[in-house]
Amino acid sequence: MSFRGIVQDLRDGFGSLSRRSFDFRLSSLHKGKAQGSSFREYSSSRDLLSPVIVQTSRWANLPPELLFDVIKRLEESESNWPARKHVVACASVCRSWRAMCQEIVLGPEICGKLTFPVSLKQPGPRDAMIQCFIKRDKSKLTFHLFLCLSPALLVENGKFLLSAKRTRRTTRTEYIISMDADNISRSSNSYLGKLRSNFLGTKFLVYDTQPPPNTSSSALITDRTSRSRFHSRRVSPKVPSGSYNIAQITYELNVLGTRGPRRMHCIMNSIPISSLEPGGSVPNQPEKLVPAPYSLDDSFRSNISFSKSSFDHRSLDFSSSRFSEMGISCDDNEEEASFRPLILKNKQPRWHEQLQCWCLNFRGRVTVASVKNFQLVAARQPQPQGTGAAAAPTSAPAHPEQDKVILQFGKVGKDMFTMDYRYPLSAFQAFAICLSSFDTKLACE
């Protein structure tokens, strides 16, 4: 049988599995109505359907050599969306197919492609940028992130990646980030994290449902407002209860724009500065986007075990402290002290005499001048020489990776913005940073 015939039979098999699952749901539904509470013993019909599909599917017992060849060719041929959905479908057939797909399909850092949902929290490619665009809906206070499928700037089609919804509180603003385009809430299973600002819109904290790699049990950085949710009896066991600070974004005060364009700094608590060095990498990349559901009792035990100091961590303070005071404390343990986070700063634009405006080279990806436009590069950090209080810091040597633009964001039309990112940022981190540019800044404009 030719490869084209195998792929055609494979796609037909997906259709038969869908029809079989639909028939099974109907039969289970009628059976549940007849037997009363017997149907309610299962959380969903999917729990019953999965083992049936694995046992009856003719694709489950495919020889590993043939399966490897089929998925390898399919992964190479279906390199772009929407055709890449067939690669995702292969990972949904059974466990053996899923394991083979995980072995063949590489992360975006290596292959430069976004395939599975976990790719949204994995670093982007090192040698190129992943081009995306953000659509803003002012009436609904929502933002949607799409993967560019065409080099054209003003296009309506794209692969949906993430969404966010703005909620204004009395003293702060929150942006809920989700994988669902419509149901954007913290109570949904698609909730990934959030962005929170202070009253002036000058300081932001990015929260993730998964802890950063340098977080220990004695120094967890959690959301202070989540304490009441931890002790509530209405906590859903399917909703990730952790809320960990992975990044801090600061805009320097610039009343009436007297100091020129906006100036911002980003402290990436989950990314070490060593990731930009030769041979460096981002540690502890997630293998699963959302942790597996656990029991309600386990969720209470894991949350109550957090130390009291985790809720009172000073990095959550939105007082008028300086930017340098928002870094990692020297009182932390040796492991955390050795973890020096990556700091990003915006690339300073140049003044154009003829146009009478500040300009940045976006290489054609931004066409409309806006105060929201920015480019982020790695900040050169001083390195201490020797040990002890008398050690004098020395300037770190310039490295080509530190001069590359890691994230750029800009306006191309009404409620349309481009977002391009690369290693070591992930799509989730880049989207959260760009959301901070949308927020109103009373003391920066």
Swiss-Prot record:
One of its GO terms (cellular component) is nucleus. It is found in: Nucleus. It comes from the Eukaryota. Residues 382-401 are annotated as: Disordered. GO terms for biological process: protein ubiquitination; regulation of DNA-templated transcription; response to fungus. InterPro entries: F-box-like_dom_sf, F-box_dom, Tubby-like_C, Tubby_C, Tubby_C_CS. Changing residue 244 to F: In strain: cv. Bretagny. Residues 57-112 form the F-box domain. Ubiquitous. It holds the Pfam family F-box-like. The F-box is necessary for the interaction with ASK proteins. Component of SCF(ASK-cullin-F-box) E3 ubiquitin ligase complexes, which may mediate the ubiquitination and subsequent proteasomal degradation of target proteins. Belongs to the TUB family. This is Tubby-like F-box protein 10. The lineage of its organism: Eukaryota, Viridiplantae, Streptophyta, Embryophyta, Tracheophyta.
